[in-house]
Design a protein with these regions (language model features):
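Short beta-strand elements of ligand-binding domains
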Residues: 57, 80-81, 103-104, 119-128
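Conserved ATP-dependent adenylate/AMP-binding module captured primarily in the ANL superfamily
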Residues: 84-114, 130-132
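Adenylate-forming
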Residues: 8, 30-34, 53, 70, ...
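Phosphate-coordination loops involved in phosphoryl transfer and adenosine-cofactor binding
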Residues: 15, 49-51, 142
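Conserved pre-ATP/AMP-binding loop-to-beta segment of ANL
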Residues: 13, 133-150, 157
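AMP-dependent adenylate-forming
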Residues: 3-26, 44
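Conserved AMP-binding/adenylate-forming
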Residues: 23, 38-84
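Active-site charged/polar residues at nucleotide-handling catalytic sites that mediate phosphoryl
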Residues: 48, 95-97, 118
């Protein structure tokens, strides 16, 4: 059986995974922070059971730990393109029907109205990735869906 992404990351826990303006992050750092993100997303539940969670986060270590956290909680990660105009982001939110939206504070103004209209809770990355307790995470099977990607929508609406 092929090791999962998280098993591989655990194997290389002390190795550098990302060098960013905010610092150097090891695979262990990413695993630890994503476990905290997963715990916060679970909010006392055992498993998100493939519930969709959209996230609008610039390419960064926060993007990685947000995506990993959604996956580790058993959710279906729906990354949103920061290059899309607000109308396309609104469309993706409506089409994906997520339970929650994770957004970077710099991008809130582009998505808040659409999330409010749909009563989708918005979680901001600084609070989500801050140090915190880690709870029991669900066991994930390799065949479980992980990510729902949307096309760029160059010839029409984005498709997921």
């Amino acid at each position: 059986m092929t090791p999962s992404l998280f098993e591989r990351a655990e194997t290389f826990r002390d190795r550098t995974a990302i060098i960013a303006p905010e610092g150097v992050f090891t695979y262990g750092n990413l695993l630890d922070v994503s476990a905290t993100v997963a715990t916060r997303l679970l909010a006392g539940r055992d498993d998100l059971e493939e519930t969709r969670v959209c996230f609008l986060v610039p390419p960064s270590w926060e993007h990685i730990v947000t995506q990993w956290g959604i996956l580790r909680a058993g959710g279906l990660a729906v990354p949103m393109a920061i290059s899309h105009p607000s109308t396309e982001l609104d469309y993706v939110l409506g089409d994906a029907e997520p339970e929650a939206l994770v957004a970077h504070p710099k991008l809130l103004d582009r998505i808040n109205i659409a999330a409010d209209r749909r009563a989708i809770p918005v979680l901001q990355t600084p609070a989500l990735v801050a140090d915190g307790p880690v709870g029991e995470l669900p066991t994930l099977l390799p065949a479980r869906p992980a990510i729902m990607l949307y096309t760029s929508g160059t010839t029409g609406r984005p498709k997921g």
